[in-house]
A protein has these predicted regions:
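Long, well-ordered, tryptophan-enriched scaffold segments
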Residues: 4-7, 11, 16-123
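Active-site phosphate/pyrophosphate-binding segments
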Residues: 77-209
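A glycine-rich phosphate-binding loop feature that marks nucleotide/adenosyl-phosphate handling sites
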Residues: 65-66, 119-120, 163-174, 340-354, ...
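Short beta-alpha connecting loops at secondary-structure transitions
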Residues: 24-31, 281, 285-291, 302-313
């Protein structure tokens, strides 16, 4: 909102015009789900097409900082000579990726793509930002490369006012090294003796059918088919049954195994289908804690929150650590071998190893001052130390926040040093540069073996994507499932959390959002109860007819706790993953937003 006040213009590319876009008065380009890659190929073509006239492309940046854009800048490890520019121009397949070609697939008008290409030019300060939604799609393993490539074409990296990357909730405008970090609890590291994992797209089939692809844990070996016989599901967090695709299969898997055990604070979907539920205490029932953290940092870049117990643990609830110790004792293990010291000592260890960056932007210092009296009050072992904020003051405030002001030394521009001198400041790739052609990425994805990709981004029709909605693409004959479904986040929930809160359920009724055009064609009016049918499930929801969803798309909010009618198999709650198939492709990223 501050950027809007300062005059920034926002362009929003999404199948649904969300509340954030409305608040920013954003121009809307209503794209079809799972078509971001053809859209960006059309955008790249339009940037090349108009470059001579408009001066759009930053050729100096491309030539200096990237490999693989054109034939003159290929990486040393390339196994073929295909480059991005020639692919976009149609040299290899005879199909130029024109805005008209892109428009037929993505639904955005070709003229709008050309207009955006000019906006993306090097003369403008542009933040080209992508959420994770367009990556949660089948067959888009090269999408991050393509986002990077479009940003690089305009030179939108490494300098003030220019950004290319991801943006979502806690990582929106929050890049750079952490200014204050949580410390370490001091617990010894436990090595995992099992070098194995089951991909989320295969987990239910692995239980039901007894086979899966093995690729290793924390690395990717060439995949091999392996047999497995799972008898117990033990869950110690999350709500996997509700958040994984193929929920109907998941329920079947939960019912098949001999036993399901769940740690749970609330009676979630996963807990409801469990045989044993171990009640877990909430953070409000625990002695102390420090909360920081997002997908990038161990903490929010500028802040760590601190809390103390509000109430004693209710009923029979225990912490996960207490349950682990009690189960361990029943298995003949000593408590001190599982957790050598208690939660209070762990908290103290984290507290005294918290670090903050000094005003010079470089020097690391102790964040918290601890006295001998503090140590005595906590009942822990340790030494007093100096720090920037007294422990008692931290707990009184409930937050440690680094003060910011204009001109401080905490600013951060990603890749700034690399962009100024890529030879002296290489990035962590085989070439040391941004790899528009990435042999290592293609080799890894292809070794996993669900489907193959090329080292440069290329368009692969998406399984369960827009083209799949037609019985015949050339004649545009609709198929059995002509609508695409997306699962936007919704004000009632954070993922699946809070769906049991009655006030929120009353305020936000979890409808299915449908366009005016599609509603009129189906004879649906606002408030009608409708049946949604996909290849893998059915649910009923009230309809909200709106102009904020593009035609051909319905939006079923993410995270409702499933309520299956056992006689009909129809979900009464509108759980999005009850309608979504598990279809591993490429590196097997879950294709939540490629669904019909």
């Amino acid at each position: 909102l501050e950027a809007k006040k300062a005059g920034a213009k926002f362009i929003y590319i999404d199948p649904m015009y969300c509340e954030s876009a409305a608040a920013l008065d954003a121009e809307w380009l209503p794209i079809r789900p799972a078509t971001d890659m053809p859209f960006m190929f059309g955008l790249a073509y339009a940037m090349l097409e108009q470059d001579d006239k408009e001066g759009i492309i930053d050729w100096d940046f491309l030539n200096k900082c990237t490999v693989g854009f054109d034939a003159d800048h290929m990486p040393a490890d390339a196994k073929d000579n295909k480059n991005f520019k020639d692919y976009v121009m149609g040299t290899y397949d005879g199909t130029p990726k024109t805005p008209e070609w892109a428009s037929e697939i993505c639904g955005i008008d070709a003229d709008a793509i050309r207009k955006l290409a000019v906006t993306m030019g090097k003369k403008n300060k542009v933040a080209f930002l992508s959420s994770a939604a367009n990556a949660r799609v089948n067959n888009v393993d090269s999408l991050p490369q393509l986002v990077m490539t479009i940003g690089a074409m305009g030179g939108h990296m490494g300098k003030s006012g220019h950004m290319t990357g991801t943006t979502m909730h806690c990582t929106s405008g929050n890049g750079g090294y952490a200014l204050v970090t949580n410390g370490k609890d001091g617990l010894p590291k436990i090595e995992n003796p099992v070098d194995d994992a089951i991909n989320g797209n295969e987990v239910w089939d692995a239980i039901l059918n007894g086979h899966y692809k093995f690729t290793g844990t924390g690395h990717y070996d060439p995949a091999e088919q392996s047999a497995i016989d799972i008898h117990v599901i033990y869950r110690n967090g999350g709500n996997k049954l509700n958040t994984n695709g193929g929920m109907a299969k998941g329920i079947e898997a939960f019912l098949k195994v001999d036993m399901v055990v769940s740690h749970a604070q609330f009676y979630t979907t996963s807990a409801r289908y469990s045989d044993i539920v171990l009640p877990i205490s909430t953070e409000w029932e625990r002695a102390h804690g420090l909360i920081g953290g997002n997908l990038v940092h161990k903490s929010n870049r500028e802040m760590v929150q601190a809390y103390e117990r509000i109430i004693d643990p209710l009923f029979e609830s225990k912490s996960d650590q207490d349950i682990a110790c009690e189960l361990g004792e029943k298995l003949g293990l000593k408590k001190e071998d599982i957790y050598p010291f208690d939660a209070e000592q762990q908290f103290f260890n984290v507290l005294t190893s918290m670090k903050v960056i000094d005003a010079d932007g470089k020097t690391e210092k102790n964040a918290v001052k601890v006295t001998d009296d503090d140590i005595k009050a906590l009942g822990v072992e340790g030494s007093a130390q100096d720090g920037e904020l007294e422990y008692t003051e931290l707990m009184k405030r409930g937050v440690y926040q680094v003060e910011r002001h204009v001109g401080d030394n905490y600013g951060y521009i990603a890749l700034e040093d690399f962009c100024k001198d890529p030879e002296k400041n290489p990035v962590d790739t085989p070439s040391g540069k941004l790899e528009i052609y990435s042999q290592s990425w293609a080799d890894m994805v292809n070794a996993i073996g669900w489907s193959s990709i090329e080292p440069i981004p290329t368009y692969i029709p998406v399984v369960n994507g827009y083209e799949s909605s037609f019985a015949d693409w050339d004649s545009k004959t609709p198929g059995e499932y002509p609508l695409q479904v997306i699962n936007p986040h919704y004000l009632r929930r954070a993922h699946t959390a809070f769906d049991n809160v009655s006030w929120l359920r009353e305020a936000w009724t979890n409808p299915v959002f449908i366009s005016r055009e599609d509603a009129a064609a189906a004879g649906i009016v606002d408030g009608d109860t409708v049946l949604l049918t996909s290849p893998v499930g059915k649910c009923v929801r009230p309809a909200t007819v709106t102009a904020r969803v593009r035609p051909g798309v319905v939006a079923l909010p993410h995270g409702a706790w499933v309520q299956v009618d056992e006689e009909t198999g129809i979900d009464q709650a509108g759980a999005d993953n009850y309608l979504i198939a598990q279809t591993p492709t490429g590196a097997a990223v879950s294709g939540y937003n490629s669904a019909l």
